[in-house]
Amino acid sequence: SKSYQEGAVPLMMTHGWPGSIQEFLKIIPILREQSKVPLDIICPSLPGFGFSDKPTEIGMDSENIAKIQHELMTALGYKKYVVQGGDWGSTVSKWMAELFPENCIGIHLNLVIAFPPSGDNPMEGVTADELKMLENYEKYKSQGFGYFEIQKTKPQTIGYGLNDSPIGLAAWISEKFYGWFEGSDNK
């Protein structure tokens, strides 16, 4: 979504799994209307997601995808840009900022993986709200993370099974969305 305005800030937004660029369609007009600066918004599909082809080479990890997306920004004529990512998009965006600090002038992540500092008491200073979030994360790891282990260890098995069943694929993905979001406002 190009603004065609002088001084527009290029913003690359990268989705995660099981998402696609579709998750950005409603936010693009809001960003345009509420931003204090004009934005050129670029939302590429991760390789193998949405309408993009599957990777043809082994090793298509977040770091390599970041290199490809940087090449895309360069090919589009952007020397400096800002990135945003969630889920897998956050790891790609992090790599873009790390690998291309002269080009990536800003980063926003809505999934940040961080670990407590080492020390005698890593929980020192953790608030009650933060403890509740940690409890929720532990519940998620024990009850909602099985899909990740299956996809990580046996991707071909689940891939073949879901490829032959549109209902199975829809159930596999929609179950994640319903489990991850609460409330009627999250539609």
Task: Say what each PLM segment does.
Residues 1-162, 168-170, 176-184:
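Catalytic cores of eukaryotic secretory-pathway lumenal/extracellular enzymes that build
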Residues 187:
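Conserved small-domain helix->loop->beta segment predominantly found in fold-type I
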